[in-house]
Amino acid sequence: MRVADFSFDLPDELIARYPMPNRTASRLLTLDGNSGAVADKQFTDILEMVNPGDLMVFNNTRVIPARVFGQKQTGGKLEILVERMLDDKRILAHVRSSKSPKPGTIICLDGGYEMTMLARHDTLFELELNSESTILEVLEEVGHMPLPPYIDRPDEDADKERYQTVYNQNPGAVAAPTAGLHFDDALLAALKEKGVNVAFVTLHVGAGTFQPVRVDSILDHKMHSEWAEVPQDVVDSIKATKAAGNRVIAVGTTSVRSLESAAKASEGELQAYSNDTDIFIYPGYEFQVVDAMVTNFHLPESTLIMLISAFAGFDEVKNAYQHAIAQKYRFFSYGDAMFVTKKAI
């Protein structure tokens, strides 16, 4: 298949640049992968979509304030976007500057902190903090929330709360697992009260999630790598859920990719997973774990719309997106959501 097969025209006014006042106030489009049927709902109607005994799997990564501004000692301004924290002092980062820094270059950050450029790894720069503080402490003090480019506005104080799930736990993401933004504590409690089980995996979403696919054929695309963890207790819950004839429902494509990465690495019976993953899911992929998913609306020609198309069917997803555009759903990170069931192969 070609990348252009996943293109669609989206009116600019449908790109959500701010979240709804309340997390659960978004709309929810349901898509039955087998029939292709769609229905317009409110997000709180998700309680009707799930059954007692189902297992909902969330990504508990925490978004770090990964965008930092500074300048070289020579005076040239630059912008740093953290891709990954290597340890308490070192990061891999994208650096925007009129001239790329060379190894040994000292970078002066806002707040009076300094970093040294150690090495370049392809498009990424390895930087080391020259301070007794940790990278995380410095980012929390002077960093900005790394809003996606299409939101097209500076970050605001409110984004520190709203571009973050209520159940975030493990710092490391530079983009939010956006399907989870629709859940508040009351909705999570209502799900548990209904008898729905919940579990948490971790995938630290990288800045590569915003990079466009730059090849014509999807087979030529190389995915960026991200760190993911599926703990043993989650594996046990999945096995118990399947054995009871209930469904595993992934909240977000990052949860899907975490679970399917674990299945792929296990080569048989599902096992715990803690490693980098560059899994690329596109039509033709056979899902091993996930039966249904909650997801936002994704960019044209993105690897995420390819994943959804693999899950629910190419034509079914294309038709659902056209319906969403006609009904003026809000798109992308701060937009509305879908509840999608898997198409039988």
From Swiss-Prot:
Identify the EC number(s): 2.4.99.17
Q: Which reaction does it catalyse?
A: 7-aminomethyl-7-carbaguanosine(34) in tRNA + S-adenosyl-L-methionine = epoxyqueuosine(34) in tRNA + adenine + L-methionine + 2 H(+)
Show the disulfide pairing: none
Per UniProt, subcellular location reads as: Cytoplasm
GO CC annotation, single = cytoplasm
Alphabetized, the UniProt keywords read: Cytoplasm, Queuosine biosynthesis, S-adenosyl-L-methionine, Transferase
Q: Which InterPro entries match?
A: QueA (IPR003699), QueA_dom1 (IPR042118), QueA_dom2 (IPR042119), QueA_sf (IPR036100)
One Pfam family matching this protein: Queuosine_synth
Q: Per UniProt, what is one GO molecular function of this protein?
A: S-adenosylmethionine:tRNA ribosyltransferase-isomerase activity
Q: What class of enzyme is it?
A: transferase
The biological pathway it contributes to is: tRNA modification; tRNA-queuosine biosynthesis
Q: Name one GO biological process term.
A: queuosine biosynthetic process
The record describes the protein's role as:
Transfers and isomerizes the ribose moiety from AdoMet to the 7-aminomethyl group of 7-deazaguanine (preQ1-tRNA) to give epoxyqueuosine (oQ-tRNA).
Family per UniProt?
Belongs to the QueA family.
Subunit description: Monomer.
- PANTHER family membership: S-ADENOSYLMETHIONINE:TRNA RIBOSYLTRANSFERASE-ISOMERASE (PTHR30307:SF0)
Q: Could you identify this protein by its name?
A: S-adenosylmethionine:tRNA ribosyltransferase-isomerase
| Gene this chain is encoded by | queA
